[in-house]
C-alpha cells in the first residue's frame, strides 16, 4: 500500500512538472529551443550507438574499416572515394531511411505559433524537414546535407550530389565520381564540424548573429529556454542556457532528457527538469 502511494505521488509530481513546463512555454514571449543527441535518439538516430540499426545500414563499412558506430565513421581517415561513399550513405540514412517522425511533428505543432528560435548540434537536417523556419534555425556544427570548400570557404546545398552518390551500386565510388567545388574546383567536404577546418561561412555567421539577437531580445521579456536531449557535459548549448538563465531574472529553464539531468541550485527556482522519454513528453505537450 505504501509502495502504491509512493508511485502515485511520483506520477503526480511528474504530471505537475509537465504542466508547469507547458504553462511556461505557452506564456513565453520568446522561446529558445536547444537540441542535441537525445532528440535524434528519440527519432531512431543514434550516432554513438553500436547497435543493430548501425550494422544494418553501415555493416559493410564496419567490417571493412573496423569502426562500430556512426560518429566514429565520421572521424575515420577514409580515402576520398570511401569518404564520399560513407557520407552519401549517411545522408541517405538520415534523410530517407530515417525520415522525420511524430517527435519532430509534435514539437513543431507545439511551437509553430511562438516567437521561437532553434539552436542545435544535431546535423541530421530534421528540424528543416519538419518545417521549422530556416531563418530561425542555427545548426551550430553544420548539417550533413551541405558541402563546404575549405579552399574558397564556400558552402552550398549538396542534396543532389549526395543523392546521386548514394545511388551508386554497393557504394563503389571511383575518382571521377568525387565532387568538386562549383566555385573554384577545389576539394569538398561535408559541412559538419569534424576538425579545425570547418568553414564558418556567411550563412553560418548570419545564423549566429540571429541567435545572439534573440538572446538579447529575450532579456526584455518572458523568455523560456527549452532544452531537449542535451547531456550534462554539453558546452555548446547547456552551459550557455544555464548561464543565460542565471543572469536574466525573466528567464525560465526547462531541461528534458532521459537519465541525464542536472540543474544548478542557483537557478533551481526558475527551472524544471523532466527525466523522461522525449517522444512521450513532447507528444503530451502537443496534445494537451
Language model feature labels by segment:
Residues 2-288:
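Conserved catalytic alpha/beta core of Sir2/sirtuin-type deacylases, generalized to analogous enzyme cores
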